[in-house]
Amino acid sequence: MGTLRVRKIAAIVGLVLAWLILLFLHTWATLAIYFANYHHPLARTLLPIIYVLVLILLVILVRRPTRRLLAVFVVFILVILWWICIQPTGRGDYLPPVAVLAYPEFHGDLVTIHNLRNFDYRTRDDYDIRYEDRTYDLKRLKHVDFLINYWDGKRDTAHTALSFGFDDGQYVAVSVEIRGQKGDTYEFLRGLFKQFELFYVIGDERDVIRVRTNYQNEQVHLYRTNCTPVNARKLFADFLKGADTLRAHPRFYDTLFANCTTTLIEHINRVLPTKVPFLQRRMMNGYTDYAAYENGWLAGHDSFAELRSKSNINARALKADQDPDFSRKIRTHFDQDQQ
């Protein structure tokens, strides 16, 4: 009698858990249908409602609990099959800063970067569009700097990027971003549902960094990393190849799984011996600099509080602005550390 009762309770608990899981899955599916791209705006309202009504009808009309569960699950599978068929095109009415993909050509230790971005800004939205071809000697690549910037005054979320420094004072910034189209506005939820494509900005620091410090009023912190020249070259080449891949195989941006930080870490984990733990890739990327410090990736012997205080480059960037020596002048805190 006791065993039978336990089995009944287990069956009820299992059924409740199954329905809770299905509720979560169908909530996701409803949002996926809602956020999909439609030719007619009315479809965004009607299709999710129809989807929910179909589910309700199945729950009412299918009598046996197991069959009801199976029927509702099959509907979810149909949504998944539709979802898989949605692929990025690499074609769109993109905003000028993300309209042109950079790509590399390797010739031994020399790499030519085509379409390197070097916009000259007068305001956030007023700029001269410039794409350049530049050649770099990978043997002269010496270090990697880590950038983290905050756009809303909050510490939890941030944008992260890297900059690769050569022994002749040149720097190439690499920033993974949304490939926004004209009229687009970023929303956290939309970023979960294949609404944006991924883009690699490969550019001059006077563009990639200066636009954030001087024209978008973001707080930018710049850290020197402990990455060796050998690993810096491997990492730089891997980023360039990643950017090149997007020409033939566009990717979707994803708020949680394919954003500025997770993509950056994807390259780091592919190339460098030290791997970034899974949870640190996704949770509160505004603290990525602290995670890098804790993992011994940042150079210097200061406490993190001291290092972070010195790393803010906004005042130096505003002062340097149009100066051709912009990259050196935003790094005077590195000179202080060496004294």
Enumerate the predicted regions with their spans:
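Alpha-helical transmembrane signal-anchor/signal-peptide segments
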Residues: 88-107
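Glycine-rich catalytic cores of cysteine/serine-nucleophile enzymes that process amide/ester linkages
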Residues: 111, 122-220
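Internal/C-terminal transmembrane anchor helices
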Residues: 65-88
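Activation targets extended, charge/polar-rich intrinsically disordered C-terminal tails
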Residues: 7-58, 240-339
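Soluble catalytic domains of enzymes that build or remodel membrane lipids, polysaccharides, and related
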Residues: 187, 193-270, 277
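Juxtamembrane/interfacial segments around transmembrane helices
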Residues: 68-74, 97-102, 116-133
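Juxtamembrane extramembrane loops of integral membrane proteins
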Residues: 109, 114-116
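Structural signal for the C-terminal ends of transmembrane alpha-helices
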Residues: 58-65
